[in-house]
A protein has these predicted regions:
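Short acidic-glycine-tyrosine-enriched beta hairpin
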Residues: 47-62, 152-184
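Glycine- and acidic-residue-biased ligand/ion/polar-headgroup-sensing regions
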Residues: 25, 31-47, 133-158
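Double-stranded beta-helix
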Residues: 67-99, 154-164, 184-186, 190-225
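Cytosolic regulatory regions built on CNB/CRP/Popeye-like sensor folds
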Residues: 1-2, 33-35, 47, 53-58, ...
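A short glycine-rich, His/Asp/Glu-containing loop-to-beta-strand
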Residues: 1-28, 92-136, 167
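Short hydrophobic/aromatic-rich beta-strand segments that constitute the beta-sheet cores
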Residues: 46, 74, 128-129, 148-150, ...
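Tight coil/turn sites that cap or link beta-strands
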Residues: 22-25, 54-56, 60-62, 69, ...
């Protein structure tokens, strides 16, 4: 049985999808993947372990079943070895990165193959106008209302962009964006927003073309203390 109301957001070097778990059915997953399951609503049972909203589970090379009444987001990559793990993280225990515009929760820590983050931006704030040289990412807006800012003329170099070169689109709950390397983008929060992002693991690959706090490119060590 597959997840009900399944939505697929990405099928590239990683897979990213969501769906509902129904009390009347059991969903069984094969064991040939490295997966992260993030419960965002309700609660469910995974092999006798209860996941409540905000809890996550990392599973590798393990066949498992889920049942309950919940909505989950799942990120996965094919497994390339025979190692096993089954790692539970309770809500409130995920690695947190404080940002000037809000914060990030690293749902699967610093996994070497893919990243899964919850990103919160508070009303009236915005992330950097940025691009990535290698990182590919898929951003789902779970809660709130935002504006998606992007460069609509590819003939202009990212580092030479001015405000007149940028376009703006509504970005609302339930929308998602797939961002490939070199694509200039920014999210501006019209309300408090919560996004769920899955990406390739180049977490320090951030080129900030404009930043309200004038932060440099790459990882900001002070945000990780």
């Amino acid at each position: 049985m597959i997840l009900k109301n399944r939505r697929v957001y990405a099928d590239c070097s990683y897979q990213y999808y969501s769906g509902a778990i129904d009390l009347s059915d059991v969903c069984t997953f094969d064991g040939n993947y490295e997966r992260t399951i993030y419960c965002v609503e309700g609660s469910c049972i995974v092999d006798n372990l209860r996941l409540n909203a905000g809890d996550s589970l990392e599973v590798k090379n393990h066949v498992f079943s889920i049942y309950g009444d919940a909505y989950v987001f799942i990120a996965q990559v094919p497994s390339t070895d025979n190692d096993h793990y089954f790692k539970y993280t309770k809500a409130g225990d995920h690695y947190k990165v404080t940002k000037p515009w809000g914060y990030e929760l690293w749902i699967n820590g610093e996994h070497p193959k893919y990243a899964f983050k919850e990103i919160v931006i508070t009303e009236g704030n915005q992330c950097s106008l940025q691009y990535h040289n290698f990182k590919e990412e898929t951003i789902y807006l779970y809660e709130g209302l935002a504006t998606w800012v992007y460069k609509d003329d590819d003939s202009i170099n990212n580092d030479d962009v001015i405000s007149d070169d940028l376009a703006h689109l509504p970005f609302k709950s339930g929308d998602f964006k797939h961002v490939k390397p070199k694509v200039l983008h920014r999210v501006k929060a019209q309300t408090d927003i919560k996004m769920l992002e899955v990406s390739t693991p180049y977490l320090n690959d951030v080129i900030r073309v404009q930043d309200d706090q004038h932060r440099p490119d790459g990882k900001i060590e002070s945000e990780h203390k």
